[in-house]
Amino acid sequence: MLTIQALANLGADTREGLGRCLNNEAFYLRLVNMALDDGGYDKLESALNAGDAQSAFEAAHALKGVLGNLSLTPLYTPVSELTELLRQGKTEGSLELLGQLKSVLSEFRALR
């Protein structure tokens, strides 16, 4: 079950994330659920597989903002690294970072 404690156990900074949601746990958890289902993950993967660094950057950058605002640090870190790599138009190493992201995303989704 997706709970504040379960998120914290996976490394999310729930105190910070909750603070951004005025300590409204139900609202925060609803936003986290929405973030876990965001279509940006699929857009990012499709763009990387197609070698489209610009589209991949746009998807990664959008995810970075969402995940950062919710303080979902284990997801934010690989997305942030991907964003900076793609900002420079580079794709080397991006599939490895995507693999890390997908692995962590699976852990978070398994909480539901």
Task: Describe the residue ranges of each PLM region.
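Two-component system phosphorelay core
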Residues: 1-112
